[in-house]
Amino acid sequence: MKANNRNRTSVAIVGAGPNGAAMANLLGLYGVDTIVVERAPQIVEFPRAVGIDDEALRLFQTAGLADELSRDIIQNVPLRMFKANGECFADIRPSIREFGWWRRNIFMQHLAERTLRDALARYPHVSLRTGEEVVGLEQDDECVTLQVRAADGQQYELDADYVVAADGGRSPVREMLGIRLAGTTHPMKWVVVDVKNARLDQPCTALNCDPRRPNVCIYLPFNYRRWEFLVFPHEDEEAIAQPESIRALIAPYVDDVDRIEIVRARTYTHHSRVAERFVAGRVALIGDAAHLSPPWIGQGLNAGLRDVGNLAWKLAGVVNGTLHRRVISTYESERRDHAKAMIDLADTFGAMLMPTSRLVAFLRDRFLGLARYAPGLKDYVLQMRFKPMPSYTHGVVVTGTSDAVGRMIVQPDVETADGARRKLDDVLGPWFAIIGWRCDPQACLSDDDRAFWTALGAKFVQIVRSRSGTCREQRIASAHDSVCVEDVDNAMAEWFDRHAAPLVVVRPDRYVAAQTDAAGMAGVTAAFQAFAARQRETADVC
């Protein structure tokens, strides 16, 4: 294929929703030329995602946007479950912040999208084209050519080294690739309503598990509130979305239903589906284009952001010539099984929490009632330990070195040598890092191995016990440029007590790629050289 320089980029992203815009921000951070093509001329404001978790906020922290996004987020929102008689039978409010952020947070998708899109202005090498639609796709071993219809109806070709399809559950790109979205579509529909000025002092997400009309009530930012009501098969979905019907549904939960302002309403069908492939040649699917989940554990968007975190650095490394092209294929092997596991969990929760069977509701209430008296089970539920965490045994990991490998590393606060308190990721930087627990990681490397990690762009960080004085001494005496920080909350000490080896290779997505001691670093480095591009000039370009 011949490249047209006027319409050519390293990565083309199809779709500028939260996943596509997040991907563009990370690629911008990594210096990758990126063009985002979005069909809609404006941000869509009908009811969509509202839940964002600690892993997602950690990703936005890497992108330099967590604080700005947090201005529109209610953090640490509990999840409460109510019986048909109004009794609360479960109050889920996770207190742990192992990744540096609260586990349950509420936002409004259109506000986040605006922040993410505005942030792209930071990067002159990233452009957003709205009102443009991808209508065709061809690819070969060298690049991908997209046929794009512009807002004026004219078509042009856009050549890219790689394409990321973030174009939603009905993904045209997925259809063009002939990839099947396997799974089920649930027969029941739900009417989703966003309202304003509802007089309801209930600062939580409430699951009203009444088999007569299961529904969800969500406390949203800026005096908004969302209700989601089950629509029964005999009911007309258009009629139930009318204002008078909506007020009748909400009336049992508020004092003055006529006072509320109905902002928007839409009927949804839930899906439990996973694409048979996440990667096809030089095209990768992310978010709803790759998997669709019911909303019961609030992980639909968060699963998409895990895709973003996993794929962005791999694309950047390949395009920038530091990583071998084969690492892109590890995106599917690392992400697909976990995405499916989250969907299965959502299906289970939906069946348990929102049954229309009175018998199932009774058995659920009995089980959760008994769980209160079993401390281990109670903690498992209330701290959301039921959420399966990704654990990679294949991909960009060196297995066999530690049970921490393939899992996300914790993120406590640490203190720098000048006394500043910072989150660990802000010290590690947005790329690879090698952590040394109570040792300088560079001192544990041979000259050749140090040169390899330096060429890869890794940052070297030494973490020491709080108030040990080591950071000050190391800053004065070290022969290397490793950063030294103190473990002020003793969190890293606890982590290394569980995972004893003192050297950890951390990937840009904060997953542990390897853990070993000084004697094992040569082997880890050799294993990583298989993931690296043999020469910078071997980077694949159109």
Swiss-Prot record:
It catalyses: 3-(3-hydroxyphenyl)propanoate + NADH + O2 + H(+) = 3-(2,3-dihydroxyphenyl)propanoate + NAD(+) + H2O; (2E)-3-(3-hydroxyphenyl)prop-2-enoate + NADH + O2 + H(+) = (2E)-3-(2,3-dihydroxyphenyl)prop-2-enoate + NAD(+) + H2O. The keyword Flavoprotein applies. FAD binds at residues 10-39, 278-288. One of its GO terms (molecular function) is FAD binding. GO terms for biological process: 3-(3-hydroxy)phenylpropionate catabolic process; 3-phenylpropionate catabolic process. It holds the Pfam family FAD_binding_3. It is an enzyme of class 1 (oxidoreductase). Its cofactor is FAD. Keywords: Aromatic hydrocarbons catabolism, FAD, Flavoprotein, NAD, Oxidoreductase. The keyword Nucleotidyltransferase does not apply. Its EC number is 1.14.13.127. PANTHER family: 3-(3-HYDROXY-PHENYL)PROPIONATE/3-HYDROXYCINNAMIC ACID HYDROXYLASE, FAD-BINDING MONOOXYGENASE. Belongs to the PheA/TfdB FAD monooxygenase family. Catalyzes the insertion of one atom of molecular oxygen into position 2 of the phenyl ring of 3-(3-hydroxyphenyl)propionate (3-HPP) and hydroxycinnamic acid (3HCI). This is 3-(3-hydroxy-phenyl)propionate/3-hydroxycinnamic acid hydroxylase. The lineage of its organism: Bacteria, Pseudomonadati, Pseudomonadota, Betaproteobacteria, Burkholderiales.
